[in-house]
């Protein structure tokens, strides 16, 4: 079994998943991608995750609804959100629930890398933002 951090990327846009997957893998992390929150919930990787990177607005369950669901199940995995439709109310809701960052698409890779590093530091107990 690998000790590499495991990151889930959830977005209904295949090109965003592929681009984000490439960036996160280039940092040396293991990645699983999912086209929806529901597909993610059917996976057997939920308890192994170090971080979830999710689109806010997706068909079916939204990224924020997924975060809330996992919290009700006792899973406090760090979340990074990105969205093409920024909404201050939703951002505040996500951050209040513990989101590490909330990025607007298109986002720059450095912002995602910083958020991911903060999430992984939070996950291993060394801090956060």
Descriptions of predicted regions:
Residues 14-32:
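Two-component/phosphorelay signaling modules centered on CheY-like receiver
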Residues 35-36, 62-66:
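Acidic catalytic/metal-coordinating carboxylates
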Residues 47-53:
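Active-site beta3 strand of CheY-like receiver
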Residues 65, 86-101:
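Alpha4 helix (beta4-alpha4-beta5 surface) of REC/receiver domains from two-component response regulators
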